[in-house]
Every structure is written in C-alpha cells, then in structure tokens.
Amino acid sequence: IEATLKLFETAFANKDNAYFHLLSGEDVVLQPFEVIEKQWQQRFDFQAMMTCERAPQYAYRFIMDSPHADSNWQRQLTGKIITKLQKAVAKVKPYHSPIYFGSQWFSVTRADWEKIMPFTDEYSDFFRHKLVPDEHFFQTLITEKLTNQIRLSNDNRRQIIFDKNVNNGNSPIYLDLLKLEQAKFNGYW
C-alpha cells in the first residue's frame, strides 16, 4: 500500500495527469490510452474502474493484526500456521463490519483521487499489519468514507486469471500471446 500511495503522490504532483491507472510491472497495456479514456467515458461515465465485493470469508484478515503480514515468512510454514489460527479465531470472534475485497489494479480520475487522499493515512494505519491489504484497502476506504461521492464500476477492465494449479492460485498467471490478443479483442485494457 505504501508503494501504491507513493506512486499516486508522484503522479498526482504532475497537474497534467487527469487519469491514474495502477498496473503491475508485469502488465501489458492492450489499448492506446486515448481508446481507454474514450471507452471509460462512453461506457462507464468515468466511474472508478475498480472491482469491489463483500467477502466475509476474509474476516480473519481484519479481526487482528498479523505479526507475519508482509514478511518473508508469511507464506512459509510458520506464517501459514498463524494464518490458520487467525481463521479459527475468526470463526469464534466475529468481525462486525462488512469486508470489502477486490483487485489492487484500478483506474481513477484526478477528481476521485482528490477525494481519496484525505483518508489514506487513517486507512494505512489500520491496514499496516493486515494480511493482503492491497485486496481490501481502497475498496474499504471508498465504501466506508466515499460511497456517495465515488461510484465504483465493479470492473477494472484488466484480464486477470488466477489458476489454482499455478502457485495455488496466489498470483495471476502469465497470459500467452493468444490470450492477450483475445483479451484485447474483448475490450480489456
């Protein structure tokens, strides 16, 4: 989350930047930015291009801080045991607020980012020691603080595929040229 906020801070400093698209270093941009902006306006009326859904199955990530969050041992045996313990605790100790979940990769307008910025420190503090905060941070912030000000499209126009047979589905798979061409044809960005 810290890296994402730094990226946005740097991009926001340039007054000419009207649109912000968060991508991974391994992403492939499939459409020219002019096409992306035109589709974004025509099909989505510049709604925040972000996936967001309620996901109570991830309550274990919220009920307590995780000592192994964002550590080298999070996905090693010790970290996996701690995560299993947190899941057990979550079954006994319910989390009473909705859990919002979605992809970290999203697009927002400058106007929407201006609305998000005042809340980033507060939410950074909450998520600092939580598991997989990038899948919850912006969705939770917007839904809790800006639900009447920022409309979410629940679509980020990214072709992201998780395959349980590859690294247990923990990371998106790499797409071959055929899948990339098909994604472009299907209007993914």
Where are these predicted regions, by residue range?
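ER/Golgi luminal nucleotide-sugar-dependent glycosyltransferases, focusing on the catalytic module
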Residues: 1-189
